[in-house]
Amino acid sequence: MNGRRKLNMQQNKRLITISMLSAIAFVLTFIKFPIPFLPPYLTLDFSDVPSLLATFTFGPVAGIIVALVKNLLNYLFSMGDPVGPFANFLAGASFLLTAYAIYKNKRSTKSLITGLIIATIVMTIVLSILNYFVLLPLYGMIFNLADIANNLKVIIVSGIIPFNIIKGIVISIVFILLYRRLANFLKRI
């Protein structure tokens, strides 16, 4: 019975930690920074960092849960734009799954950095394709913006690609700075 109680306690602590990371990620969605020379609707926030912390501490399912909860809460509180949270979830999921897949085989600083670089590239490609075929046409349809459909290539090349590269680099740097300091603490909670 004592072993079962200890296992339940560990599972509860893990669930609480994932919940806290989800809450932190949600709060971070409200702290946004515009990137000069890019369209004003493309703003940078650090809400993917808690998802990455959850992924690299507890595994990819935990990271996906944090990203999903963050974006569901963001949608429920913004009550308007379903496309933004959906795109953010896809960006975060493609980023964290790629980074973790590369890192998990050889857990080293080099594989971590390599994983984050490749994750930035994958996220940029995934979001460029999704924006071209799904997200931007959906925005155009929902908000009745005909200009979007006529300028997809320009929007992708001059906005989406540079934004996702910058986002991947910034998120990676912040994550690297925090991960080494917080990983052991998060595992002990």
UniProtKB/Swiss-Prot annotation:
Start-end of intramembrane regions: 45-56
Disulfide bond positions: none
Pfam families reported for this sequence: ECF_trnsprt
Membrane topology: Multi-pass membrane protein
GO molecular function terms attached to this record: riboflavin transmembrane transporter activity
Positions on the Periplasmic side per record topology: 30-44, 79-82, 133-159
Topological domains, Cytoplasmic: 1-9, 57-58, 105-107, 183-189
Localization of this protein: Cell membrane
Bilayer-spanning residue ranges: 10-29, 59-78, 83-104, 108-132, 160-182
Keyword annotations: Cell membrane, Membrane, Transmembrane, Transmembrane helix, Transport
InterPro entries tied to this protein: ECF_trnsprt_substrate-spec, RibU
Gene Ontology CC entries for this record: plasma membrane
Family: Belongs to the prokaryotic riboflavin transporter (P-RFT) (TC 2.A.87) family.
Its biological purpose: Mediates riboflavin uptake, may also transport FMN and roseoflavin. Probably a riboflavin-binding protein that interacts with the energy-coupling factor (ECF) ABC-transporter complex. Unlike classic ABC transporters this ECF transporter provides the energy necessary to transport a number of different substrates. The substrates themselves are bound by transmembrane, not extracytoplasmic soluble proteins.
Complex formation: Forms a stable energy-coupling factor (ECF) transporter complex composed of a membrane-embedded substrate-binding protein (S component), 2 ATP-binding proteins (A component) and 2 transmembrane proteins (T component). May be able to interact with more than 1 S component at a time.
Protein name: Riboflavin transporter RibU
